[in-house]
């Protein structure tokens, strides 16, 4: 159940933000060179590994009373199973209660919120997102510890 409508809304991307899409893609290309789109293989999305500190930081954000945290991920047009596999990944790594906070949308700009943590600033509607984009993997936010530091120092302090 979602009840905190006055909270700061934070969306978190999955692929190459929460989980290591790139490493799995490279490994599948090496292991199965005949497969043009590794992400089309059944089990690809469910088998992705979490990025370092991603789970701990996501849980920390979720535990802050002033934040309303959702996962906002785009589907793969190459793999219709990605919908169910991403849902299973969320349950396995973040718990069943987080499944209710999973949004799969091909256009991220349709969602209203304050922050979007994503490895891309465009391509799936991010460029139309009205809040602030926290570009994961950038020089300002190279990892999850820097993302947490931002929210600890900038956002939590401002609301205290």
Q: Language-model segments: what does each one mean?
A:
Residues 1-48:
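Active-site neighborhood of HAD-like aspartate-dependent phosphohydrolases
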Residues 73-115, 122-124:
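Substrate-recognition "cap/lid" segment bordering the active-site pocket of phosphatases
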Residues 115-153:
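Acidic, Mg2+-coordinating phosphoryl-transfer loop and its flanking beta/alpha structural elements
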Residues 26-30, 87-89, 131-135:
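Glycine-rich, phosphate-binding/catalytic loops in enzymes
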Residues 5-7, 66, 99, 111-113, ...:
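A general structural motif
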Residues 49, 54-84, 90:
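Substrate-recognition element of Asp-dependent hydrolases with the DxDx(T/V) motif
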Residues 45-49, 93-96:
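Short, flexible loop segments at the rims of nucleotide/cofactor-binding pockets, characterized by
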């Amino acid at each position: 159940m979602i009840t905190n409508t006055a909270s700061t809304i934070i969306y978190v991307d999955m692929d190459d933000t929460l989980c290591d899409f790139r490493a799995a893609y490279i490994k599948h290309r090496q292991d199965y060179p005949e497969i043009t789109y590794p992400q089309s293989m059944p089990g690809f999305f469910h088998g992705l590994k979490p990025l370092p500190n991603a789970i701990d930081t996501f849980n920390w954000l979720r535990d802050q009373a002033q934040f309303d945290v959702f996962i906002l991920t785009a589907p793969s047009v190459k793999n219709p199973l990605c919908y169910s596999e991403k849902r299973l990944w969320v349950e396995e790594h973040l718990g069943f209660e987080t499944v209710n906070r999973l949004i799969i949308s091909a256009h991220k700009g349709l969602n209203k919120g304050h922050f979007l943590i994503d490895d891309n600033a465009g391509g799936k509607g991010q460029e139309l997102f009205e809040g602030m984009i926290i570009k994961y993997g950038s020089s300002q936010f190279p990892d999850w510890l820097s993302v947490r530091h931002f929210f600890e120092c900038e956002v939590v302090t401002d609301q205290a």
